[in-house]
């Protein structure tokens, strides 16, 4: 079972079997929600129903975090990612997939920032589903990653509209800023904030029709910034200039617009972005070489 409401201990749980509704009285820890902040309290419960009859003696409370860690054993460093915080700047198709993958890897906390709301057209590629249509993308993705038993906070705001001190304070509190917005102004705003705060930044975006994409890792003091990297890419890319134009971006790079593309192509790009994110977050792990300036 998954308890969505209440705080602290849940005293009454209800379910429906073939024989009709029943109620199991017990104490099961659940998550608690405070405004836009979602905090998991560390346990899930399972109630076995055999032949339509509730078997109350089969209620089991497990340490879900430890159970999930068993599938990540030896793939990450001993400390894992529980004490890491990631800012997801952009909760669209690409950002939602990267966030989900990082939560499955064990990242302990997310700060999700996006001003848009999920619509039906997004469902062909977004990690969220029809139940989230009409909701804030930030809140929907915050709850999506929370279902992997991590803490999350949603902020419904235009990143470009934030003043420098507010954005700097936000990024200074995280270990990695993952920017997947398709607004050049937003990307460069985040890039500048990363340089001011010394926070590592990962910038990912798809090209037109998701024919390809780019992942740029910025490590202040150890790598070029986004502005420098974008300036060099024309010299090293084998993709034609017209195909390399970022998705959702008009020729003047100001107006955002809908762009065709398959979720499968974005999944490939999000997997690459996630690998680089893990290299930064787990510097002694098996992917650490990806983040090496050498």
Segments the model singles out, each with a brief description of its role:
Residues 1-56, 169-176, 180-294:
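Glycine-rich phosphate/adenylate-binding loop
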Residues 74-117:
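Glycine-rich adenosine-cofactor-binding loop
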Residues 83-84, 92, 123-127, 255-262:
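Glycine- and acidic
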Residues 115-151:
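Glycine-rich phosphate-binding loop and adjoining beta1-alpha1-beta2 segment
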């Amino acid at each position: 079972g998954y308890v969505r409401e209440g705080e602290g201990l849940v005293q009454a749980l209800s379910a429906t079997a073939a024989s009709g509704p029943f109620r199991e009285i017990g104490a099961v820890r659940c998550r608690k929600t405070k405004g836009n902040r979602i905090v998991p309290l560390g346990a899930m419960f399972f109630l076995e129903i055999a032949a339509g009859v509730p078997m109350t003696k089969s209620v089991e409370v497990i340490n879900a975090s430890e159970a999930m860690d068993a599938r990540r054993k030896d793939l990450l460093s001993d400390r894992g990612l529980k004490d890491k915080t990631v800012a997801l700047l952009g909760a669209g198709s690409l950002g939602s997939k990267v966030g989900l993958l990082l939560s499955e890897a064990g990242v302990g906390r997310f700060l999700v920032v996006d001003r848009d709301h999920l619509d039906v057209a997004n469902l062909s590629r977004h990690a969220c589903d029809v139940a989230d249509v009409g909701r804030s993308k930030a809140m929907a993705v915050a709850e999506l990653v929370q279902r992997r038993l991590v803490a999350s906070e949603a902020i419904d705001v235009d990143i470009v509209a934030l003043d420098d001190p507010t954005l700097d304070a936000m990024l200074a509190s995280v270990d990695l800023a993952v920017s997947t917005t398709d607004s050049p102004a937003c990307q460069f705003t985040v890039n500048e904030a990363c340089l001011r705060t010394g926070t590592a930044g990962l910038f990912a975006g798809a090209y037109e029709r998701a024919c390809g994409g780019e992942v740029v890792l910025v490590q202040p003091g150890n790598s070029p910034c986004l502005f420098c990297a974008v300036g060099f890419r024309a010299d090293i890319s084998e993709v034609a200039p017209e195909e390399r134009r970022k998705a959702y971006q008009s020729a003047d790079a100001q107006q955002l617009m809908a762009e065709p593309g398959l979720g499968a192509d974005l999944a490939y790009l999000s997997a690459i972005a996630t690998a680089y994110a893990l290299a930064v977050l787990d510097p002694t792990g098996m992917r650490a070489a990806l983040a090496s300036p050498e």
